[in-house]
Amino acid sequence: MPMLNRRLFYAGYAIHLVHTLKFLNVDYLSTKVFFMEKSKIKNVFVEGAISPEFIANSIAKHQSKTAIGAHDIFLGQVRADLIDGQEVAAIEYTAYEEMANLKFHEIREAAFAKYNLSCMHIYHSSGRVNAGEICLFVFVSSPHRKEVFEALHHVVEEIKNQVPIFGKEVFKDDSYQWKVNK
């Protein structure tokens, strides 16, 4: 959907929602807050594999942040699993990105509420990622190491359990099956 049409759609939807909430005697101020918060939601999706250069640049940008004492990184890599005698050559990731970005945002905000974090970046691939390439990059920073270790583990588990991202495992012969997270 072109950007202008998308904005008109969301504006129309927001007006409809506010009128519906008024009719139901629901405080629509909370609705305004929701739509304001929505503007803070970042797009975490990167087309294709996440490159080592992208990861290195992200790390390098934090050298000047001297209040940070610890960083921890998770890199999810596509495995060349052997399934029923066939080797996975790639995974094609798809998602309803708006819903997935909202879920990533909720996970991120919950981690900031639970742990003493300074910074967090999450990136996930969309489209085709070949075996051996990076598909998930989570970068967590804090004044102290204990928080980054605990927070990173928590965030990665929440991503795997909650975010609606679908992976089509493509085999070397171009046949495929839909991935099941374990």
Task: Say what each PLM segment does.
Residues 35-134, 150-153, 157-182:
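N-terminal, polar/charged subdomain of small-to-medium soluble alpha/beta proteins
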Residues 1-3:
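Methionine residue identity
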Residues 6-7:
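Basic polycationic patches enriched in arginine
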Residues 143-145:
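Helix N-cap motif at beta-to-alpha junctions
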Residues 11-20, 26:
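Short hydrophobic alpha-helical segments enriched in small aliphatic residues
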Residues 17-21, 31, 82, 174:
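Amphipathic alpha-helical interaction segments
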Residues 139-141:
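Short hydrophobic/aromatic beta-strand micro-patches
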Residues 23-35:
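Short, Lys/Arg-enriched N-terminal segments with co-localized hydrophobic residues
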